Amino acid sequence: MKNRKLLRPALCLLLALLAGCGPSREEPMEPEAESRALLSSGDLRGADLRELDLTGLEEAAYRWDFDTRTLWPEELPEGFDPARLLELGKDPGLGLRALHGRGITGRGVGIAIIDQALPADHQEYGDRLRFYQEYHTAAQGPASAHGPAVASIALGKTVGVAPEALLYFLADDLGTGEGAAFSRDLSWYAEDVDRLTALNETLPEGESIRVISMSVGWMPGDPGAEALEAAIARARAAGIAVVCVNSRDPLLEPWMGMGRRPYGDPNRLEDCLPGAFWEESLYSGEYRGTDGSLLLVPMDGRTAASPAGGAEYAYFAGGGMSWAVPYVAGLYALACQVKPEVTFEEFLAAARSTARPVSVWRDGVEYPYGKAVDPAALLEALGA
């Protein structure tokens, strides 16, 4: 999943000679210039910003990603409180912590994830990591930001939906080649789904995999898509639910991620907002969820485990469906705890029947954008 563009030394020299400048004499970027470049990118994870004056950047500030290693200056945008944002982002929201307090934690339910490389020792999940294997180029590089994020959103001890679920994790690639030569191919993910299905047959009672989470989507004609869909069908036939991004699958089509006011309470629907990546489509009339058919879970403004260290965290202003998928997998793990025989079809029906409408006002117009999942009501409908 890591796409590195590598140039051979001879090619580098040839390009330099053609440019008429010989070897590069470009001076290193000054620290302040480097910091300002990071500000423009919006990714401030690990950045040292102490020499900057960030006042006046209120509009941009709430789109920044940062982590517990970001070093902030004294001069911050007015009202911007990164520590508070990070702490609020740890709350999975929708009343889940109240359910955790009642013992509904996904205890003993297996969640399998296929994603990028994972640091195995993070405090959010390390003590419940039952199986971890890397394949292909995922085994050649360091842990990514994506892997620990999706794992912790699903089952993290403090940030996760199912904080006592068990983790089975495969790190693999979504294709072959590197850089411009990268070619997307889902065949390896198909093999991984089959690996997990086979692994599940060997697991002791009380530790079985009930759901596979893959933060990936595809089109029918993509290389390997047919093989992956066949593997998913085999997993489902073996009693394992599979959650990914697939609007052509009736079990997955309804799910969508939503946002939240920066300092809003993650447990109050009044503080929910349209998702950052699809908000404009709501106002333009292109959004497909205005009829209330979509089921919404938290996606933006989330804090997750970081690969920077076993106790480090990263805050993501905008999440994308990559963060919504493990959230749904975690919800299903809770359902499996309260009703071990539950199917994903039953879970989906209960989610639909108990979800609550949400809308947003803009320029005097109310825009409905779906229904927020109500975990307590969902689980009660299943017999919790």
Regions found by a protein language model. Give the residues of each.
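Substrate-binding/access-modulating region of protease and related hydrolase catalytic domains
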Residues: E32-L39, H100, G106, L174-P262, ...
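Autoinhibitory propeptides
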Residues: E26-G89
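N-terminal domain-start motif of subtilase-like serine proteases
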Residues: A83-I111, E134-Q140, A276-W278, V373-D374
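C-terminal subdomain of the subtilisin-like protease fold in secreted/lumenal serine endopeptidases
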Residues: E205-S213, Q337-A384
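Extracellular S/T/G-rich loop segment that most often corresponds to the catalytic His/Ser-adjacent loop
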Residues: D115, A237-I240, V245-Q337, E341
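Subtilisin-like serine protease catalytic core
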Residues: A98-I111, Q116-F131, A139-S187, E205-I209, ...
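C-terminal motif of bacterial Sec signal peptides marking the signal peptidase cleavage site
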Residues: L18-G20
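Bacterial signal peptide processing site
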Residues: G22-S24
